From Swiss-Prot:
Name assigned to this protein: Cytochrome b
Record keywords, A-Z: Electron transport, Heme, Iron, Membrane, Metal-binding, Mitochondrion, Mitochondrion inner membrane, Respiratory chain, Transmembrane, Transmembrane helix, Transport, Ubiquinone
Protein's job: Component of the ubiquinol-cytochrome c reductase complex (complex III or cytochrome b-c1 complex) that is part of the mitochondrial respiratory chain. The b-c1 complex mediates electron transfer from ubiquinol to cytochrome c. Contributes to the generation of a proton gradient across the mitochondrial membrane that is then used for ATP synthesis.
Other facts noted in the record for this chain: Heme 1 (or BL or b562) is low-potential and absorbs at about 562 nm, and heme 2 (or BH or b566) is high-potential and absorbs at about 566 nm.
Residues that coordinate or bind a ubiquinone: 201
Amino acid sequence: MTNIRKTHPLMKIVNNAFIDLPAPSNISSWWNFGSLLGVCLILQILTGLFLAMHYTSDTMTAFSSVTHICRDVNYGWIIRYMHANGASMFFICLFMHVGRGLYYGSYTFLETWNIGVVLLFTVMATAFVGYVLPWGQMSFWGATVITNLLSAIPYIGTNLVEWIWGGFSVDKATLTRFFAFHFILPFIIAALAMVHLLFLHETGSNNPTGIPSDADKIPFHPYYTIKDILGILLLVLFLMLLVLFAPDLLGDPDNYTPANPLNTPPHIKPEWYFLFAYAILRSIPNKLGGVLALVSSILILILMPLLHTSKQRSMMFRPFSQCLFWILVADLLTLTWIGGQPVEYPFIIIGQLASVLYFFIILVLMPITSTIENNLLKW
C-alpha cells in the first residue's frame, strides 16, 4: 500500500513542500529565517486573535481596553507583550532574510523575489496600522504624521488623506478602519507567503555558493526540519527573554500616555524597525522628495536583479562586493540610529550623508564593483 502522505491530495502538497522536498546539502543557518518568519506570522495571528477578543476599536475606550487586557484578562499581559515584541522579532527575521537574499544573489529568482518585496511592503503596512491601535500619544501622532505624507501627492493628495482618515483628522473612523486593516492583512500575508513558497519550489532553493545544486540534493525531512526546530527554539527563547524581562525595551514611553490631539510629543518617531526609512524621509527638506525617497528605499529592492552585473551569483567568492555589502549594513544601522535622534546638528547632516550613501552603494558602487571583479577573473 502506498504511503498516505504521497497519495492524499492535501497531504501530498504538505509532503512535497516540507517532507520530501529536495534541498541543497550545503545551505547554512541564513536559510533558517524563512521558517522563522512562518513561525512569527502564526504566533502574531494567534496572539492577535486573542487580543482582538478583548480590544475595542473606539477612540474613547481603545486605550482603556489595552490597559484592561494587561491588568484584568488572564495572561493578557503576556499575550499583549508577545504580540508587540513578536512584531520586532518578525522584522529582525525579515531584515536577515532580505540581507541573505542580497548577499547570496537569491534575487535572481525573479518571481520569488518580487513577491517577497510585496510581502515586505504588506508586513510594514500591517505593523504601521497595528501601532495605531493602542491609541497612545505616539500611536496618534505617528498615524497623523505618516498618513499626512500622502498629501504630498500632487492634485489628489489632500483628498486621499481625508479619504483614509474618514474625516478631517485622525479620529474614530480612522481607528476603526485601521483595526479592520490590521485584522485582514495578516491573512493576506499568509496567502502571499504561500505564493512565495510556490514560486520558490518551482526553482528549488539557492545555496551559499550560488552554483546549481541539482547534483547534490537531500530530503528536507529530517535534515532541515531538525535544523529549523533549533532556529525556532532560539527565536522563542530570545522572544520570551524580551517579553518576560524587558517588555518595553523596544517601545516608546510616550505610548503609555493616552492620545491627545492638543498636545504634540517633542519627538515623533515610529517603532525601531521603521527608523531607517524615517531617517531617509527626514533627510530631504522637501515633502514630496522625502516621500519618494522613503518609498524608493524599499522599492529599490525590485531593481536588484537588473543591477546584478557579476558573472557569479553569490558574494561568497567576491571580497570587494562583500566589503560593500557590510558597509551597506553599517549604513542602515547608522540610519536607524539617526531616525531616533532629534532634528538638529550634527544628526541632520549625518542622516543626509547616510541616505545618499545608501542609494549610491546600491545603484552605483555595487554594479561597478561587480564589473571590476569580472575583469579580475581574467587575470
